[in-house]
Amino acid sequence: MDTATHIAIGVGLTALATQDPAMASTFGATAITLIVGSLIPDGDTVLKLKDNATYISHHRGITHSIPFTILWPILITFLIFTFFSGTNPFHVWMWAQLAVFLHVFVDIFNSYGTQALRPITNKWIQLSVINTFDPIIFTVLCIGIVLWVIGLHPFAVFFPIIALLIIYYMIRFKMRAVIKQQALKAIQQEHHPVKVFVAPTIKFMEWRVAIQTDAHDYVGKAYGRNVVFSDKVERQTLSTDSILWKVKGNKDIRTFLNFSSIYRWQTTTLADGSTEIRLIDLRYLKNDHYSFVAIAHVTNDNVIDHSYIGWVFTEDKLQRKLYAK
C-alpha cells in the first residue's frame, strides 16, 4: 500500500491501543510505536538514492521478510523504552509486532507484492486485488479516524471498519476471478494461454489485464465484465543463442527479470550498428505507453555501453535517463 494508507492504519491502531491499560498512560509513545511500526518496513525506500536497480531489487524484499518482520518490532521496542522509560516493553513490542505484520500483510494484496515468506522462498507474493492506493480503503480509514477524534469509542468505530474491509477484500477477489474468466474466454478462442495477469486500478470497476499465450501477448483493460485488449504483439522466441542471454548478467536486466512476473522483450538495430534490447513489463500499460522497462545497448563486441531500469512515462525521458548513466 501507499504511505498515506499505512499512516492511516497506524493511526487506527493507535486508537485501538489506547484501550490497552498498559499503553493508555503514554499516548505519545503509543502513537510513535504504531505509526512507526506501520511505516518502518518501507525504510528501504532510501535505496533509491543509490540507483533504481538496487531499489527495485530490495524494495518490499528483505525488509518485508520473516526475519525483519520479527526484528523491526524488537528495534522499535528498544528505542521506545530508551526514550519513554515508563512504558511496558512487552505491550509496546506486542503492538509494534501487530503494526509491522499488518504492513507486510496488506502489501501482498497489490500487484507489486512482497517477499513476505523469505527466506523460506524468494517468490514475490502478488495477489493483485487491491491497488497500491485504494481510495475506498483510505476514505473509510479516514472517516474512522475522524469519528474517533470527535469522541466515539475506538472499538465502536474500528471493529465495524475491519468487518467492512474484510467484506470489501472478498468482493475484490470475486471481481478479479470474474474478470480473469472473461479474459480467458476471449483468448482461448485463438490461442492457448500460458500466463494471466489481472490487477486493479485506482478506479473500482477498471482492471488491468495481460495474457501471454504460446504465440502472442495481449494487454488491455476490463471495464466491469467487459474486457478490451488494446495491444496484441507476436511473442519473440527465446533460444539459448538469443542475445538476451548475453545481457542477463547486467544489473539492470537481471533486476528486471527477477522482479517482473509477466513481460516481453524485443530487439532493435540502432543507427551505429549496436543492438537495443528492451524488456517491457506488461503490467504497466497506460495511455499506450509501457512505463516499467529495462533497456540495454549492446555493441558489436557484445559490450553493454548503456543500460537503465525504472518507471518512465515518455520515450524522450527514457532516452535521457538511459544516456545520463
Explain the meaning of each model-derived region.
Residues 1-186, 191-200, 210-214:
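N-terminal membrane-targeting hydrophobic helices
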Residues 182-325:
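C-terminal regulatory/interaction regions
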